[in-house]
Amino acid sequence: YTEVDTLSLHDALPICNQYGGVLNDPILLRISQDEFWFSLSDSDIGLYLQGVNHDNRFNVTIDEIDVSPVQIQGPKSLALMKDLIGDQVELDNMPFYGLAEAKVGGRDCVISQSGFSGEAGYEIYLRDSTLYADDMWNAVLEAGKKHNLMVIAPAHHRRIQAGILSWGQDMDNQHNPFQCNLGYQVSLSGKGEWNKTADYVGKEVLEKMRDQIRAGEKPYKLQLVGLSLGGKPIEEYAPDFWLISEDGKEPCGFITSPWYHPEQGRNIAMGYVPFDGTLSKNGFPIGKEGTKYKVHLPDRKSTRLNSSHLLIS
């Protein structure tokens, strides 16, 4: 929903492509005056973008490029990045979602202060990655030695705590932006001020839904919320959704992403519960804090859940 002509050079903003349902939640990077990259989540959006421009209404070329990302995340990420790229980029002054060009392992890269953790972190986009992946990768490992760098999959408890969604796990094209807490991305200002005049795919549907929500109607049944979950620490990613109910009755929703949070000393999760019409001060749908549910685990006893507001980073 981002108006791309407002993006600065070497800047980036999160956007969400949708047509009623969310097709993808990429980051849009403006590399130069007339060059934009979509850093995609777990769905193929290239053919969709080409389809939007099937009649050549926009004077653009849409194609997949030979670029691959690597993330450096965590409290030591700044120090590691300084060792990795030296003074090529003023990292201390780089804003969140800021972009810069740099060489890593002697290869051309784009650096973005962003990531999938909710913590301090950076993403390295390697150009011509099929040719130079080893050069970049080995340089990262070498710079990370003194920082005790670990090569791991995403730390899900971090992104769950920060309210960072995983497409295909927490939402997909069956969900609209409002019910998965992305409604703020639809408005121009991000503060609930719907003053965007430019057209975009799904605008009529979403603006109608916005009006229904503000009028106290419920255009959908389930709302994504943050949850705290009792019981033993969850040590493995859930292979399927866990159903939840009110007081052991028929299932009324489901958990999408559960994980143990070591600092909080409890299990946290995201899940869909019945939408009761509760809105934030900016007019966006949220869950009602303190509502209790039961989770139904396969071959295990049910466990109490306490719902709270989903923390949006």
Task: Give the residues covered by each predicted segment.
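Acidic, proline/glycine-enriched N-terminal capping motif
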Residues: 8-15, 21
